Amino acid sequence: DLTAPCISSSQVIRTAKLLTVIAEHLGKSEDVKAYSEDIKRISNGLQKYAWDDEAGYYSYVIHDETGEAKEQLRSESGENMNKTMDGIYPLIAGITTDEQTGRILSHLKSEDEMMSKVGISAVNMKAGYYATNGYWNGNVWFSHQWFVWKTMLDIGEADFAYKIAKVALDSWKREVEYSYYTFEMLSITTGRGGWFHNFGGLSAPVNIWASAYFKAGTFNLGFDSFCENYSFENDFTHFSADVSHYNGKDSIMLVVMNDKNNYVVTVDGEKAVFNERSKGTFEIKLPSDKKRVKIEIQLV
């Protein structure tokens, strides 16, 4: 097939970024160089050939017989054929400009386009090729939403991250209470699950989200932040962590404490910027200008 999606290249970039951090910690400078070159080369290809400024999505790219990029995949009417979850994946790779990020977020957040009542649609609901009876098309896949959720922590979109998790938890709860099945996906039209009835890809992200916001002793970061070490008190009334932060953005760290108490939050000993999403659940801003920070949460 001569048509390339965005998700494969984007996941290679994201994986290479993770490996770069590990290689840096291990002192593997040659590996860091190799990964960095791959990231740059693939990122340049996506930006040069795949971005469609009119649509605000990255495109499927058709290649010629020699493997050279030829054109973006479009319908007979000229509509971009990748107004889909695939078309937003370079955001997850962390390679989008601020303008591209804004365009993609506008699609993801729009209840007319991708943010359905049961989660993020795999296909833009306003696209000419959106269908309600497909397998990928017309449905919500939690595994891909997990990647979007992590990315929202990376770029400081705490409110939207919570909305993704909360809508997914509520949708999953309704289906499981009715059928006691964990289907592959949820239908946007009916809100019901479909296809294989014991699918771990649906239930695993749900467990992560439930813990991320409601289970004391849990913390989460985006893809571009890494916890060097951490400690919780046994009763979850004190937390400390050393965090490395690589993307130069105001990212978010989620920490869930014992919800029976009040706390003070500091970053490098200074009062932190944070939001208490619910009692004991903290969304802490990691300053964009610091690569390494000390996070501490303690009783007032």
Positions of PLM-derived features:
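Generic long, charged, amphipathic alpha-helical segments
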Residues: S116-W141
